[in-house]
């Protein structure tokens, strides 16, 4: 029980400006009994959208101070959900917050999946069984360092598509998704006696636009789908509230450590007397390929967390546990003045690593950290609650080196092309592909005995280039490259461009134009190249490979290994170059020797006693490759230069 009564504003602490009257307004709405008289049904008849209360919010719905942490169900193996939830409760949390991810639930238009790893309703039920309330953030856009912010790539098959807008094609697709999601989540809302106390509309829209008519339309879509209008709220940075908020919805504040005082003052100025709900308190940060590891000390954050809770604020820690962006789901940032969809390769593109450890209180593999105990002490000092004991950390195993001696070349197992004779290479979206790799081939009509420039106007996002199967170099969007000089070319030679989608941009103005593959027509020596054949290589499910012998270049390597018992381990990819790993059919995600991430998390839940299968696709394969399983993660290796793209510009 909080030391702050829900029905009373606590006195201001000295760290908050004395002239501001802030506080906790948990009783501005009564608990669930007062919410039972929803007007949703009548709204469906009249077409009116039931109003909410700008002085409400999750704490008002819950009738108590909310102490929450973020944990996203697709990033944690389902077998481990309960372990993580128990640890959340043991740290002193009373609520779990999660996004819902449109792209994993609707991989193809109109086809929905809420089973297995995607069973959000079961995730919510398990949280409730562990004594936790739940906040759900359905998006439709979620950011989250997730490919395209959770938007499904098939949206961009419509050449007129404008996401996060009132464009009819977007709103119709979003409504269909929200309808399906609400069937899973709405029965679990507090208004129906369930644990869900908050539903966020959109996500930090103020950092993207200020079309309030769009936000009104999106709110109406939520209500039509069946989400309770009393549970709805928006979230933005403190300086962007005016752009993203709606006048009658509660607002949440998202900000970095050390910013609480200014953020609370901004909220008071924007909406005097409003209850304080911190939607995201960034207790860590994410990492980019080729950059240094990000960490944040927990001592000062624990002190600020205590101050916020003492001031009566409800707080969500982003993240409680980060987990892993398994498969192709890691996204990318596009920072800087050129970050818009018209500048293409000039965008400051920063792809995210596979690990979403986030330096959070609970590590990628669910281990408690010093930050966990610092936050636990801070929370308990305010609530006085007797907390459950901290569950034991999961056991780890090591794996002896696994030789990847036998492989099969990508060139020997290409599928039939999905498009031929194209004047301009189609993007992944154009051919109905979402993730993985895509190959473009054409025969050169003219040769040259002198150096010539191959120009790819926009690479999304990493292109390996070959002439008659011989590697020439790579062009990396991350390095703002567009051009590779070829020493010479023969007439009739086959030019192959193998493009990896290393993650669509998930944040910022570059969002609308995000497509994967090649965008625009390549040129060689100033002449536009045409006659392209396109090969779709989604690698989902993982391909069936016949590994017969040594292999170089883009190769699949297949091997088996034995374990006596299943346990978590970390595959050391230091000897590999760039690619992806599958174990027993599970895509562990991308690796890249530019760092800082060196190990891929292999959950024990993906293993079985006895024989296990590993499949590695390495873009720059060579004989003698091997991997081994370590007992600890290595996420802070020194960044390196990619030698394969060193000659491009």
Sequence positions of predicted segments:
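Aromatic-lined ligand-binding clefts that engage carbohydrates, nucleic acids, or primary amines
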Residues: 450-466, 495, 561-584, 591-592, ...
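Catalytic-core region of carbohydrate-active enzymes that cleave or remodel glycosidic bonds
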Residues: 225, 229, 256-363, 367, ...
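Aromatic- and acidic-residue-enriched segments that line the glycan-binding/catalytic groove
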Residues: 110-116, 129, 140-165, 215-219, ...
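N-terminal carbohydrate-binding accessory modules
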Residues: 37-95, 125
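An active-site-proximal structural segment forming one wall of the substrate-binding cleft
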Residues: 119-136, 159-196
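The substrate-binding groove and active-site-proximal loops of carbohydrate-active enzymes
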Residues: 66-77, 102-118, 156-176, 200-211, ...
């Amino acid at each position: 029980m909080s030391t702050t009564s829900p029905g009373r504003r606590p006195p201001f602490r000295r760290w908050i400006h004395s002239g501001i009257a802030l506080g906790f307004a948990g009783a501005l709405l009564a608990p669930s009994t007062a919410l039972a008289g929803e007007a949703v049904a009548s709204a469906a008849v009249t077409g009116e959208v039931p109003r909410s209360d700008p002085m409400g919010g999750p704490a008002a719905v819950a009738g108590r101070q909310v102490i929450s942490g973020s944990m996203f169900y697709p990033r944690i193996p389902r077998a481990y959900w309960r372990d993580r939830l128990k640890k959340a409760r043991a740290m002193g949390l009373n609520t779990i917050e999660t996004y819902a991810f449109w792209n994993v639930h609707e991989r193809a238009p109109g086809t929905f999946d809420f089973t297995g790893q995607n069973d959000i309703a079961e995730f919510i039920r398990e949280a409730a069984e562990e004594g936790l309330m739940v906040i759900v953030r359905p998006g439709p856009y979620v950011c989250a360092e997730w490919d395209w912010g959770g938007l499904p790539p098939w949206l961009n098959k419509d050449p007129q598509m404008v996401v996060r807008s009132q464009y009819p094609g977007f709103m119709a697709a979003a409504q269909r998704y929200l309808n399906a999601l609400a069937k899973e989540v709405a029965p679990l809302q507090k208004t129906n006696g369930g644990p869900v106390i908050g539903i966020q509309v959109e996500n930090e829209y103020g950092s993207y636009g200020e079309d309030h008519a769009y936000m009104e339309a999106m709110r109406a879509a939520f209500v039509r789908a069946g989400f309770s209008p009393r549970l709805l709220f928006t979230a933005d940075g403190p300086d962007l509230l005016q752009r993203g908020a709606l006048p009658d919805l509660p607002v949440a504040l998202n900000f970095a450590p050390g910013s609480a005082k200014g953020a609370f003052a901004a909220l008071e100025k924007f909406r005097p007397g409003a209850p304080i709900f911190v939607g995201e308190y960034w207790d860590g940060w994410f990492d980019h390929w080729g950059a240094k590891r990000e960490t944040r000390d927990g001592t000062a954050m624990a002190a600020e967390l205590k101050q916020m809770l003492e001031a009566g604020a409800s707080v969500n820690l982003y993240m409680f546990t980060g987990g892993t962006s398994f498969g192709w789901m890691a996204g990318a940032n596009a920072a800087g003045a050129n970050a818009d969809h018209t500048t293409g390769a000039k965008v400051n593109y920063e792809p995210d690593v596979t690990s979403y450890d986030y330096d959070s209180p609970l590590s990628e593999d669910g281990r408690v950290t010093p930050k966990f105990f610092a936050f636990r002490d801070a929370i308990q000092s305010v609530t006085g609650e007797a907390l459950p004991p901290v569950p034991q950390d999961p056991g780890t195993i090591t794996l002896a080196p696994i030789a990847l001696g036998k492989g099969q070349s990508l060139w020997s197992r290409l599928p039939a092309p999905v498009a031929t004779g194209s004047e301009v290479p189609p993007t992944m979206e154009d051919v109905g592909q979402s993730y993985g790799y895509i190959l473009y081939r054409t025969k050169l009509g003219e040769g040259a005995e002198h150096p010539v420039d191959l120009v790819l106007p926009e690479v999304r996002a990493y292109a390996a280039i070959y002439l008659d199967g011989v590697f020439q170099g790579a062009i990396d969007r991350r390095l703002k490259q567009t051009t590779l000089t070829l020493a010479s070319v023969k007439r009739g030679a086959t030019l192959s461009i193998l493009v990896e989608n290393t993650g669509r941009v998930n944040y910022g103005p570059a969002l609308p134009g995000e497509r994967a593959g090649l965008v625009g027509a390549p040129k060689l020596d100033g002449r536009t190249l045409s006659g392209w054949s396109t090969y779709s290589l989604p690698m989902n499910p993982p391909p069936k490979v016949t590994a017969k012998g040594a292999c170089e270049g883009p190769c699949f390597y297949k091997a088996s290994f034995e374990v006596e018992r299943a346990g978590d381990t970390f595959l050391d990819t230091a000897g590999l170059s760039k690619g992806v790993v599958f174990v027993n059919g599970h895509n562990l995600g991308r690796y890249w020797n530019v760092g800082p991430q060196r190990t891929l998390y292999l959950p024990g839940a993906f293993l079985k006693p006895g024989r296990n299968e590993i499949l590695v696709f390495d873009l720059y394969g060579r004989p003698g490759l091997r991997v081994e399983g370590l007992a600890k993660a290595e996420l802070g290796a020194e960044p390196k230069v990619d030698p394969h793209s060193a000659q491009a510009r």
